[in-house]
Structure formats: C-alpha cells, structure tokens
C-alpha cells in the first residue's frame, strides 16, 4: 500500500490537530464542575462518562496523521490508568499543555533534543518534590475523602472506606452490577473458594440450600476418592469425636460419594464433599493455602502420605464452614498465624516477580483469601446508562484509594502541581539555553490542570493560578464552592501516585512528540474506488458480469 509522508513542522502541526481534538474532548470532564461526555455504542444505550481513558479510547479520527497525534495522547491516559488507575484526564491535560508549549519553541528554532533533556530534568525534580510533600494516609476518614473526591460522591467514599477497613490492604474488592437501585457492600468473612457440595443431599439448611458445619474436621487431599475404604479409618476416628467432616479432594465419586450421602440421610454422621478449587499447578497451590489456613496436612502421594493411613491429627479445623451450590467458605480456620504470615510473604514475592497480568491477578486473589477477605461493591442505578457511568466512577475511586494507601496523598484540585513549581524553578539557576526552555515548558504545563478545573467551574483560570502562586503551601482553590481553602484540611486530596504518574507519562509522550521529524501513514483510498476489479466472466461462460 502507498504511504504519505509529512516532515518537520507540517508533520507536527497535523499531529497537534489530533492531540487537540482528543484533549479538548477529555478536559471538559476535569474537576468537581466538569461535564460528562456521551459515547455512541453500536448496541444498547449510549455511555455517559467523565472517565478520561474511556473517552480517549473511543476517539478515532479520519485523517491518519491527526489520528496518530490523538493515539499518542490516548497512550498517556491508558498508561496512567494502568499504573495508578485514575488521573487519566489530568495526564491528558498535562500532555496537551507540554506539546503545545513545546511546539511553539521548536517552531521558533529551539533544538527539540535539548528541550527534551530540560523536560526530563524538570519532571525528575517535580516528582522528588511530590514525594517530599506527600502525607501518609491514615484512618477510615482519610480513605473516604480520597474515594469521595475521585467519584464526586461522598456515599461512594464511605462505602469504599468501609470495604477497605473490613478486608484490609491485601483484601480483594470487586465491583459488580446489581439488579436493585441502591449501591451496597457485601463482605465475605473467612476464606472462600468457588466450589460447592458434590451432592445436594448433603445440605443441612434446606431454606438457604446450604450445608453448615460447626467446628468440623477438614480432610484435604489432591487424590480422587472413589472407594470408601480409602477414607474409612479416618472417618471412624471423626465419628468417635461426634464432629462433622469436610472433605476437599480432586473428586469424590461412585461408592465413596454414595456411602457419605446414605450415612448423612440416616443421621449416622455428617460429611460434606467438595471438589478442589483451581486447575493444574494452581490447584495444588490453593490446596496448600487451605491447608495452612485450617492447620491441616495436605495428603498427597508426593509427600509419601497415603489416604488409608491418615490420622485425625493430620486433619484441619475451623469454627464454621458454609458450603453452598457454588461456593465454600471457611470461617476462622485453625491455622498457625506464623505459617499464614510466611505464606503471605511468599505470595507477595511471587506477585513482585511475575510478568503476567493474569498470574498477578490470581496471586492477588490468593493473597486476599489468606490475609484479608473479599468485599463486593454491588452497584445499583435506575437505568443501564446510569449504572455503567456509576460503575466506572466507583472503579476509579477504588483505584485512587489503593494508590493513596501506597504512596500517600497530596493537595488536590491541581494545587500540588502549583506547589512543586518553586522546586522546579530552582533548577533554572543551573540550566541554560534550550534546556532551560524545556524546564519552562514543564513549569507552564504544571499550571494547566488547575487552570482547566477553574475554567470548567466558570472562572478565569489564569487569575486563580497567579493567586495560588502567592498563597501558603497547602492552600488551594475549591472549585465546588468557589473558595480558597486549606486543601488537605478540607479533604480535597489526590493520591501522590496518581499525580506523579500523570506527570511522568505526559512528559514522556510530549518529549517523543517534540522530537518527531517525519510521520508516515497509509495513503487514503481514492473515493469511489471499486472494492474488487471486474472479473469479466469466467472462461468459456460468455461473461457472467
């Protein structure tokens, strides 16, 4: 396919049009008075959102060169979303400001490679200062503030703060769509895995269709049990203790399952069989996790252990086990706290080492089941459109909260960027020429988020930026109430990780943009060109066309 090539100024101008098209659509959403953007969907109702990355991903421009510019800035948003989970609009606003400011200087004859050096130096200094002014997040109230600012909803803030308090930092919080109108929090205490009873005859509560075992013994094996003789010796020991038994095995079938069911119906003893969770190597790891939580020994031939010789001392214990059709929940397992701590440490190391997102997610789930718990935020709304928009906002709020716990918080509303300008200005004393121009580009761009928040609130951005430069550190502009307040005191805060990631990613793409000297794209198809040439009929058939 033929290609079109644009060089230097012409290339950068074409790409800038794409940058502006995308950034202008995204930046209307920033701040407490930011507006929404409506996205067309091929099927179903349109999506209404104020999530920067969702809007950026939707934009596809007709002109190939403009589209490349738009895609570069979309990359800033998606990278920030990947690292911090929020701050995508801020990153887009910063990128646009750096690109526009930088382009003026490159057009005027500045050396883009030296400008790039200045941009990188300024961003490094800004990030150091952000780390220095970040405050660790403490208490449920502070967590609620971060989530409420991100979602622009105090109720959501309280919900996420409660979820994090209940399941801990290592717990898993998932967001699901609910069929009702209200948004609720559902917390699963104890360790839960997605396998239910082997037979419905094992249930003890017919109303809830659950098998509830109080103070049961727990047998864990990676073998398939089809003959009752294999577990008879340990079964007799458990019956003597007059306690129920939970069997977690690769499978329980045939005569073994029939015997367990018959004895349950007769009232001789109460045993519930459950298939082992997971598959392959992950199954073995999950069985080991359950063994550690319950204080059981995993009966496996790899360790030379035989089911027939299992003793009651090798079984685990828990205060309660609830088995439904699809899930098994073990509450207050009898595992030793030192063993659990060691296992948690081992899983954390694996999370750091893995390069696969899927593996990381599964390891995170295992960590949550061992160390914390699982909380489910069930999002409700009146219409499907509102439900999707609300779900996106809650996901952003959850990501922002996690980021805040990791690296602390800074003043929100674009204020932190204004506060780091003094530190960035200090390097101008030792920087000259085009490198100093690069530093000045970053200084100007750092004002852009606050300027845009003010403009979305109907104020003059430049006036507010100038005033804040002369205010004490921590003072900022509350666009929701049109007042100047102490941002952290008022609870208007941003996670330091989100602020840092937005700045670093914006600078990275802007520097690449400014150093672009040629752009190559596919030549558009001529209008009205035939899709396929006329075949003129097939040989010997007199021309079918």
Swiss-Prot record:
<feature type="binding site">
    <location>
        <position position="413"/>
    </location>
    <ligand>
        <name>ATP</name>
    </ligand>
</feature>
<dbReference type="InterPro" id="IPR002423">
    <property type="entry name" value="Cpn60/GroEL/TCP-1"/>
</dbReference>
<dbReference type="GO" id="GO:0051082">
    <property type="term" value="F:unfolded protein binding"/>
</dbReference>
<dbReference type="InterPro" id="IPR018370">
    <property type="entry name" value="Chaperonin_Cpn60_CS"/>
</dbReference>
<feature type="binding site">
    <location>
        <begin position="478"/>
        <end position="480"/>
    </location>
    <ligand>
        <name>ATP</name>
    </ligand>
</feature>
<comment type="subunit">
    <text>Forms a cylinder of 14 subunits composed of two heptameric rings stacked back-to-back. Interacts with the co-chaperonin GroES.</text>
</comment>
<dbReference type="GO" id="GO:0005737">
    <property type="term" value="C:cytoplasm"/>
</dbReference>
<keyword id="KW-0413">Isomerase</keyword>
<keyword id="KW-0143">Chaperone</keyword>
<dbReference type="GO" id="GO:0140662">
    <property type="term" value="F:ATP-dependent protein folding chaperone"/>
</dbReference>
<keyword id="KW-0963">Cytoplasm</keyword>
<dbReference type="GO" id="GO:0005524">
    <property type="term" value="F:ATP binding"/>
</dbReference>
<protein>
    <recommendedName>
        <fullName>Chaperonin GroEL</fullName>
        <ecNumber>5.6.1.7</ecNumber>
    </recommendedName>
</protein>
<feature type="binding site">
    <location>
        <begin position="86"/>
        <end position="90"/>
    </location>
    <ligand>
        <name>ATP</name>
    </ligand>
</feature>
<feature type="binding site">
    <location>
        <position position="494"/>
    </location>
    <ligand>
        <name>ATP</name>
    </ligand>
</feature>
<comment type="similarity">
    <text>Belongs to the chaperonin (HSP60) family.</text>
</comment>
<feature type="binding site">
    <location>
        <begin position="29"/>
        <end position="32"/>
    </location>
    <ligand>
        <name>ATP</name>
    </ligand>
</feature>
<comment type="function">
    <text>Together with its co-chaperonin GroES, plays an essential role in assisting protein folding. The GroEL-GroES system forms a nano-cage that allows encapsulation of the non-native substrate proteins and provides a physical environment optimized to promote and accelerate protein folding.</text>
</comment>
<dbReference type="InterPro" id="IPR027409">
    <property type="entry name" value="GroEL-like_apical_dom_sf"/>
</dbReference>
<keyword id="KW-0067">ATP-binding</keyword>
<dbReference type="GO" id="GO:0042026">
    <property type="term" value="P:protein refolding"/>
</dbReference>
<keyword id="KW-0547">Nucleotide-binding</keyword>
<dbReference type="InterPro" id="IPR027413">
    <property type="entry name" value="GROEL-like_equatorial_sf"/>
</dbReference>
<dbReference type="InterPro" id="IPR027410">
    <property type="entry name" value="TCP-1-like_intermed_sf"/>
</dbReference>
<dbReference type="Pfam" id="PF00118">
    <property type="entry name" value="Cpn60_TCP1"/>
</dbReference>
<dbReference type="InterPro" id="IPR001844">
    <property type="entry name" value="Cpn60/GroEL"/>
</dbReference>
<dbReference type="GO" id="GO:0016853">
    <property type="term" value="F:isomerase activity"/>
</dbReference>
